[in-house]
């Protein structure tokens, strides 16, 4: 027979009383009423907040967007094949956040910050809210540093500054993404962190862009955020905010960052799809009433911070796709009014062989002029006007039989300027090369060169400077000014290259 020892029992009871944990966990739980098309209607969740993360039974996450009297409308961030009517949903008390930090560079992630490049987990513990308030007035300063794109026509006529929002707008297949990729490639060695956000694009296109960046050594300082065409609308809607959050981390550390949103038309369409399925009232072009706020709160996060805040910057290059060149549609006009200027790409110019196909007449940079380097500002001041006048004269001259000599001369120079500004893809030019090319055209030093040989002349001029005048390039890149001595050297080089070229023609 087992003997009972009272002292042993009392010590066990005392121990259990001591170890007793009285904490109570309260969770806000609801039930799925209806599920379909990436939208869930949930009963319960009385304490849920707008924009709060929800967790479904199968681990799928969602965001509460519609808070109604008797149900909550949520969008699902995943396939949600395991979510059924009657399954439980739990509110997390958190807002969506993404991992950020140095380890993100060189990686391809989805809008939740999860790696999709097959290189394993990203070793970072830092996170940042996807939706953050834009910096206030006191935290900012005016744009004053150049963000060189490496594309002569942009840096000379439509300059972009660090902290600016410059829209790239045009029809499909006019080279919008090409300009953005060239700008990323041109940041090599400039200590700029780049974020490329691909929204609703084909996976093959994104893979091609990643490969181009890798080949040119640009992936090392770039983060690619991809929400493909096959992803749920909620992820396409979130992708730009994820890109902004990743860039903000570096901006608040005092670094310069560049974010490409390719493209915001697809994000607006994803948001329209979500809103209509949530039964929000449609407005113009069936977009919801707050579609302006969708883009304004995103693009306002781009800024040049004050010195007290570390002096970092986020430059945004949003891309918008137009239909048949119609910039007066709803989304294009919204984004044009939010940004600090636009680069308009024309399908007609593209098809005529002018690449990049920039329509100088309606492209503008509202704040970039203050950031333009003195060297290019000094010589490119009249370039935009000359090209705009050339376009007008070219249209007029089709109907005029005899033109006066001054008009003919202007037309001939315009043709040569057009040829000088042609630039192949993935070949950005440095400041010194741009200065040399623009100077030759604007000063009329190549008026005798046949139009068909202008591109060849520009290539030979750049090669000559690299081989024989390396000190000229170094001086321009260092001082960013074109003084009288450098100007005399440049004029001498241009005439020398021109003479040797005309002798062989």
From Swiss-Prot:
Pfam families assigned: ATP-synt_ab, ATP-synt_ab_C, ATP-synt_ab_N
The EC number(s) this enzyme carries: 7.1.2.2
Domain of life: Bacteria
Binding sites annotated in the UniProt record for ATP: 170-177
UniProt key word Ribosomal protein: no
One term under GO cellular component: proton-transporting ATP synthase complex
PANTHER family reported for this sequence: ATP SYNTHASE SUBUNIT ALPHA, MITOCHONDRIAL (PTHR48082:SF2)
Function field: Produces ATP from ADP in the presence of a proton gradient across the membrane. The alpha chain is a regulatory subunit.
Protein name: ATP synthase subunit alpha
Record lineage: Bacteria, Bacillati, Cyanobacteriota, Cyanophyceae, Synechococcales
């Amino acid at each position: 027979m087992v003997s009972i020892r009272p002292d042993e029992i009392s010590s066990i009871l005392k121990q259990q009383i001591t170890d007793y944990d009285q904490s109570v966990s309260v969770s806000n739980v609801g039930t799925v009423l209806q599920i379909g098309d990436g939208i869930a209607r949930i009963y319960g969740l009385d304490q849920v907040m707008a924009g709060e993360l929800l967790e479904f039974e199968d681990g799928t996450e969602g965001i509460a967007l519609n808070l109604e009297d008797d149900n909550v409308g949520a969008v699902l961030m995943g396939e949600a094949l395991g979510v059924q009517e009657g399954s439980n949903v739990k509110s997390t008390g958190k807002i969506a956040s993404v991992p950020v930090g140095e380890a993100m560079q060189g990686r391809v992630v989805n809008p939740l910050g999860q790696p999709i490049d097959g290189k394993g987990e990203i070793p970072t513990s830092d996170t940042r809210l996807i939706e953050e308030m834009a910096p206030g007035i006191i935290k900012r300063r005016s744009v004053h540093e150049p963000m060189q794109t490496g594309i002569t026509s942009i840096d000379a006529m439509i300059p972009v500054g660090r902290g600016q929002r410059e829209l790239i707008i045009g029809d499909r297949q006019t080279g919008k993404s090409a300009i953005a990729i060239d700008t990323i490639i041109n940041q090599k060695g400039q200590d700029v962190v780049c974020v490329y956000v691909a929204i609703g694009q084909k996976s093959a296109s994104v893979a091609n862009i990643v490969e181009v960046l890798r080949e040119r050594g640009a992936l090392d300082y770039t983060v690619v955020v991809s929400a493909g065409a096959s992803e749920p609308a909620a992820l396409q809607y979130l992708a730009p905010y994820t890109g902004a959050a990743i860039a903000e981390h570096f901006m608040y550390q005092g670094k310069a960052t560049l974010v490409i949103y390719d493209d915001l038309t697809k994000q607006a369409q994803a948001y329209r799809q979500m809103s209509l399925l949530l039964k929000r009232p449609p407005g113009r072009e069936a977009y919801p009433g707050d579609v302006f706020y969708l883009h304004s709160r995103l693009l306002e996060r781009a800024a040049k911070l004050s010195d007290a805040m570390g002096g970092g910057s986020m430059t945004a290059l949003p891309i918008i796709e137009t239909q048949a060149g119609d910039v007066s549609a709803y989304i294009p006009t919204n984004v044009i009014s939010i940004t600090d200027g636009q680069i308009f790409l024309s399908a007609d110019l593209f098809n005529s062989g002018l690449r990049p196909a920039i329509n100088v007449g309606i492209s503008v940079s509202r704040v970039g002029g203050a950031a333009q380097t003195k060297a290019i500002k000094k010589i490119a001041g009249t370039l935009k006007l000359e090209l705009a006048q050339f376009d007008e004269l070219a249209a007029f001259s089709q109907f005029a039989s005899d033109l006066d000599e001054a008009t003919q001369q202007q037309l001939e120079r315009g043709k040569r300027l057009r040829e000088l500004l042609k630039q192949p893809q993935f070949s950005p030019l440095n400041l010194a090369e741009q200065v040399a090319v623009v100077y030759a055209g604007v000063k009329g030093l190549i008026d005798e060169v046949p139009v068909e040989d202008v591109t060849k002349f520009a290539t030979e001029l750049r090669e000559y400077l690299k081989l024989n005048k390396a000190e000229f390039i170094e001086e321009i890149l260092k001082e960013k000014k074109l003084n009288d001595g450098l100007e005399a050297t440049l004029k001498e080089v241009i005439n020398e290259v021109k003479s040797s070229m005309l002798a062989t023609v």
